Amino acid sequence: IGAGCFDTGLKIYHYGSIIVNPKSRIGKNCTIHGNCCIGSKGGIPDDSPVIGDNVDIGQNAQILGGITVADGVRIGAGAIVTKSILIPDVTVVGIPAKVIEK
């Protein structure tokens, strides 16, 4: 985890193996559950996610590549997010992650 990745109000539940690429940016009041990976995809270290405010990242979720996650998104346990989620306040689940609830 790199310095300056997180804004204020971060909550980590069930911590343990949480991987965050130092180039990732995570907004205010986000929640991360254990065994998550927030990082680059395909060996391109500068290609890392930008995550909005109030995002909830479920257990074992992976957010990969130079994508954007909008404010208020809920990412389900085990989801793999490889494309931007630009609609705020939705729930995404699955492999690959898809919107199931607005």
What feature does the model see in each segment?
Residues G2-A3, T8-G9, Y13-P22, G27-K28, ...:
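Left-handed beta-helix
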